[in-house]
Every structure is written in C-alpha cells, then in structure tokens.
Regions:
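C-terminal beta-rich recognition modules with glycine/proline-rich loops and embedded aromatic residues
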Residues: 260, 310, 375-389, 394-489, ...
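N-terminal secretory signal peptides and thylakoid transit peptides that target proteins
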Residues: 1-18
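Well-ordered alpha-helical segments within folded domains of soluble proteins
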Residues: 109-126, 182-198, 233-248, 282-299, ...
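Long, well-ordered core segments of solenoidal/helical folds
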Residues: 65-97, 137-156, 208-225, 255-275, ...
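Extended ligand-binding groove/face enriched in aromatic
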Residues: 99-103, 125-262
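Low-complexity, Ser/Thr/Pro/Gly-enriched N-terminal "stalk/linker" regions
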Residues: 19, 24-25, 35-113, 138-171, ...
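Carbohydrate-binding/catalytic loop surfaces
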Residues: 83-107, 158-181, 231-247, 274-296, ...
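Active-site neighborhood of glycoside hydrolase catalytic domains
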Residues: 237, 246-270, 287-325, 353-356, ...
C-alpha cells in the first residue's frame, strides 16, 4: 500500500438474508467438504491443487508459523473489527473499542483488513476444523449482512458495504478524491473474504452478501464510459478483476465477467501484452494483483492475451526486479530494470508484493506444470522472505511490512504511512498484516498438485496428503532444508501403475531418487521434473536427495555485489547489534559449514569471522544479505 496521499441492474434482494445466521449455513458441513462447487471449469489448467484440509503440516517451523497466526485469529475481537462497518452503516457499535492504525475510525481506507480476516478464518477452519475461527467468520458475515441491509437508512445504494461513505466513490469517479482513500482496493478485500467464507465454509449468507456487493460494483461501474473507467483505474484497486472473475467461475453468471473486464487497466496491460517492461516508478503492489486478475481472466475466457499479460509480467518481475530473497520493490515502488545493488535499502521487499507474486506463480503453474522455474522462484520467496516475515518470538505471529536488505538490516520495519516495527493486535492493520494472515494459514497449499492420476511434488516439508479422490495417503518426512533429503511414503489404495513427478530444482546437481532403498534409473536433470512411474504397493517409500552447495548470486546490476545461497536458502551474516555503514567485503572461499545438524556456517568478512545462517531465521539481530565480493 502506498504512503502517498494522492494515490490512493442491482441485485434486488441484497440484504434480504440479514436475519439468517451465517452459522446456520454451515451446520452439518465438515470443513473439508464445505466448499461450494464452482460453476465453471478453469480453461487451460492441467495441474490442480488439493483442497484445504487434504494437506496437513506436521511438526516443523512451518507448522509453528501457522499456529502463531491461528492463535491471533482465535484471539482477535470481532466486535472491534466490526466497529467501522457499523458506524458507517448507521448501526450501534455496541460499545466496542475502535481500532488504531490502518483501521482507525478516520483512516482513509479503513475496513480493508476485515476481508483478510474472513479469508484466514475460513482457511483455518477448512484446514484444521477450528470451530472458533468458523464462528468468528460466521458472526462477522451475519453482522455485515445487517450493515448491508441498513443501506437505506444510511443513505447508501443497494448492496454497498464498507467502513467509509459511498461518497468517496463519487469523488473517485469525478477525479476529486484527495483524502488518500483507495476505495476499490477495500472493496476487493471484502469481496475476496466473503467469497472465501462461501467457498471454504459453505456459507450461503456470505454468498448473498457477496453477490449484493458485487451487484453494487456492477451498477456503479456500468454507468461509466470506458474513458471514465480507465481514469478510475489510475487509483489502486487491488485485484477487482481477479475476484470478479472468481465470482464468474463460481456462479457461471457472465455478468460478473463483464464487470471484471471493466477493471482491465489498459495503461498497465497494453505494454505487458507486448512484453514491454514499463514498471519503473510504478507502485509495485498496485500492479501485481492486476496480473493475477489477468491469469484468472484467461482461465475464465481462454483469451490468450490475458495469459500473455500474466506470463510476461511474471517473467519481467522475477528476472529484472527481484532480489535474491524473492521479494521486489524499494519504498513500495519498482525501480529501473535490473536495479538491485543500487537499491539495498531499509524499505525493500514489501511483504504484500511477494505474497501476491506467490499467488500469480501458483496460477501460472496450473497452466504450465512442466516449468520448474515457477516453483524454483516460489520456494525461494516462500522460504526466504515469507517464512521469515513472521516474528517467531510473538505468540500472535505478527509480521514485518518491509524486509530490509541494507547492510546491517533488521526485520521489524513498518510502513512509511504509520511507521512502527512489527504489526500489533489492534494498532496496525497494515495491508501486509492482512496478507500475512492469509499466508501463514495456507503454507501447505502448494506442496502437492495433481494432474489426472499423476501426483506432483513441488515443495519439501513435513506434511501429510490425503488424496481422498484415490484413497491414497502420502506422508512426507524431512528436515529440509537443513537436510538435503526427503522421504515420501505412499499408503492406502495405491495399487496399479501411476506417476509421481518430483521437482528437481535448478540449484542442485547429482539428484537421486530411490524407492525402498533402490536407486531408480530415471532422469534427474536440474531444472526439470523427475518422473517416477511404477506399479505401487502400500508402504512404498520414495527418497529424494537434492545435494546442496554454496552458490554466489550476483546482483543483476553489479557483478561484484552478491548474496550467498545454499540450496534454496539465502544465508545472511549475523552482526548482533553492530551497525554497518557499507557492505562487508567477503572472502567467498572462506565460507564453511560448521554443523551437519543446522545450517550454521562461518566466513571471513572485512578480515573478521562472521557467523552465517538461514535468512528466514535471521531474527533479533542485525544481518547482512548482499556482500562486496570485488576482492575475489
């Protein structure tokens, strides 16, 4: 989210279900089966993720992250989260305290965070069956329905729902909005949260509120000329095209596709369709959700221009605008192509950008499951930035907004608009806090995919897959990336011949795959998928070994500035509380692993020994990621 203040047919029965409890709409639904069936199949998709609840994390750092976020989701007071909605829609706030930060009663785009909470609660319920999270989501939906039903008394048009007046949209359309609000950004979050409660909890009340609000968007935007709409799109609008395309896919009603396509931003899409990099100077996280929308619009329509936009955007961003940890942007903005070493600052790598790039990567993988580069990037960003985004010392799993890459950087940096260090229970509500809630409640969603009877293994972490469609259970056991080995045991109705495809990352060499201790004679070329086709027996154990080594990753714009990687892991230097005025000069030949039981290394920098460790664990101390290697 930018710190710049300058950037920023109706459905008739929209509020008719306000008296129906959302909790009632999920009674009898098991979390794994509550999701509604989409009305339309995605076009061009040849790999499919497993549903929430089919993959469970087991004891690991990743499960710890999930549990900390779950603690916060169970703790947070829904009455406080409802304060701005109730006040705006002229209902009693029931004596609740108001929030601070980006959800304060006078903050321009207050009420954006609540959609993230809805999504995260629904995900936790779908994954774990947590009824506290289910009930919080149900209560919020019921109260949002009451707010929406009171629009007549509040002076709003049918279907409208948010924490600020509808008049902000009139100002947006007139080009006079100057209070810092990004109103469609907020509407996107609310729509997405309601959609997820419908999909993952089976809540028909969430569906009705969702379609009421979507109907309002259709009415509001349908009155504008194409030129007026493109002017509206100059203000950040999140992933409106993505969520409306999702609603189209969910309902099969072409009205929502028509509405989605009104949010196709020509000034951004046209250059990308021609594979032109014009990202320099653009607010980064304003763009990435649009790219996700292009991918979803391709899957909804089959129009290859949308696919090209999404794919070109991914290639341009990852290859020319991405730091070694997988994040992008400095001060929330894209810089010139390949400008990496030139922008090693305290305000690099806004968390939202990386979260959304992971979403885009996942969508593109479903279209091209043979392209290993997609999940090589996914793993790099997921592990090095997003796992480390969360403060492991905080039982509520609070997060950093930026991940600093300056010499002697330290996690715990808030946004320019509001400042701070880590997010808090009630006084932050940044965009990155919201996406963090989503991130750390779905860490398991991209470990495995399926393509017909083929199982695809993309990520290596302790987990259990219940492939219920086939009666197969896959148990993955590993200490990766401390170890270079993972095992996958298949049990259940595994008989017959079928294929397991395993990602062989581009950074490895000499990878091996064995079954029940016997090395298999299959191709394990780095940057490919190894294909293991066999007649299976319950209990068969696949062992995957991916040898790791130190590789220096030079910055795109300066061959003498580089980061240290070991397998998928970025290694950073631990400088305690020492400040650094410049990049330390590293003796690259001195890098030595000092423990087989951890990723502990040492090296010589500026003539002194420095400890190195995995960047995702670099907490509570000043660190260094990029090094001066000009003396080597």
């Amino acid at each position: 989210m930018s710190s710049s203040i300058s950037r920023r047919r109706l459905l008739q029965a929209t509020g008719a279900t306000a008296a129906v409890s959302a909790a009632e709409s999920v009674i009898g639904s098991s979390p794994a089966r509550a999701a509604s069936t989409a009305g339309r199949a995605d076009i061009g998709v040849s790999a499919h993720p497993f549903a929430f609840g089919q993959v469970q994390l087991t004891a690991s750092r990743w499960l710890d992250n999930q549990n900390r976020t779950r603690n916060y989701l169970r703790f947070v007071d829904t009455e406080r989260l409802l304060y701005n909605f109730r006040a705006n829609h002229r209902l009693s706030t029931n004596g609740a305290a108001s929030n601070g930060g980006w959800d304060g009663p006078t903050f321009p785009f207050r009420s954006h965070a609540q959609g993230h909470f809805l999504t995260a609660w629904a995900q936790v319920y779908a994954v774990t069956g947590d009824t506290t999270c289910r009930d919080k989501a149900a209560h919020m939906v019921a109260e949002l329905a009451r707010c929406q039903a009171n629009n007549g008394a509040a002076g709003f048009n049918t279907g409208y729902l948010s924490g600020f007046p509808e008049s902000d949209f009139s100002a947006l359309e007139a080009g006079t909005l100057s209070n810092g609000n990004v109103p469609y950004y907020v509407i996107h979050k609310i729509l997405a949260g309601l959609l997820d409660v419908w999909r993952y909890m089976g809540s028909t009340q969430a569906r009705d509120v969702l379609l009421g609000l979507a109907g309002w968007v259709d009415w509001r935007t349908g009155r504008l000329s194409s030129g007026q709409m493109q002017s509206v799109l100059r203000t950040e609008f999140g992933g409106m095209n993505a969520v409306l395309a999702d609603i189209y896919q969910q309902t099969g009603d072409s009205r929502w596709l028509t509405t989605a396509q009104r949010f196709d931003h020509a000034a951004v899409f046209d250059p990308l369709a021609s594979n032109q990099d014009r990202l320099n100077g653009l607010h980064a996280n304003t763009q990435v959700p649009k790219w996700i929308g292009a991918a979803r619009e391709y899957q909804a329509t089959g129009a290859t221009r949308y696919r090209d936009i999404a794919l070109n955007a991914w290639n341009i961003c990852v290859n020319a605008h991405t730091y070694v940890i997988g994040g992008n942007s400095q001060a929330e903005h894209f810089r010139p192509p390949n400008a990496i070493a030139a922008y090693l600052n305290r305000d690099t790598c806004e968390s939202c950008n990386t979260y959304n790039m992971l979403t885009l990567t996942r969508e593109l993988f479903t279209l091209d499951p043979n392209r290993v580069a997609l999940f090589d990037y996914y793993e790099r960003a997921w592990l090095n930035q997003m796992i480390g985004q969360q403060n492991p010392a905080d039982n509520h799993g609070h997060v950093t907004y930026f991940t600093p890459l300056n010499p002697g950087g330290r996690r715990g940096v808030g946004p320019a608009w509001g400042g701070g260090t880590w997010s808090t229970d009630y006084d932050s509500f940044w965009c990155c806090q919201g996406t963090g809630l989503e991130m750390h409640t779905k860490l398991m969603d991209s470990v495995y995919f399926s393509s017909d009877t083929t199982l695809i293994v993309n990520l290596f972490m302790p987990s259990v897959l219940n492939w219920t469609q086939r009666g197969i259970t896959v148990t993955q056991t590993t200490s990766y990336p401390v170890s270079d080995t993972t095992t996958l045991q298949v049990t259940g109705n595994v008989s017959g011949t079928w294929t397991m495809r395993v990602r062989i990352p581009s950074w490895t060499a000499g990878a091996t795959i064995s079954v029940n201790g016997t090395t298999q004679n299959i191709t394990t070329t780095p940057g490919s998928y190894a294909t293991l086709t066999r007649s299976w027996t319950s209990g068969d154990t696949v062992t995957v070994r991916l040898p790791m080594r130190i590789i220096m990753r030079a910055a795109n714009d300066n061959a003498n500035i580089a980061a240290i990687t070991y397998g998928p892991v970025v290694l950073s230097g631990n400088y305690g509380n020492t400040s650094l005025a410049s990049l330390p000069s590293l003796n690259t030949s001195s890098i030595t692993r000092t423990s087989s039981g951890s990723l502990a290394f040492t090296a010589t920098a500026n003539g002194s020994t420095v400890g190195l460790g995995p960047f995702h664990d670099a907490h509570g101390h000043n660190y260094n990621v990029y090094w001066n290697t000009s003396g080597q």
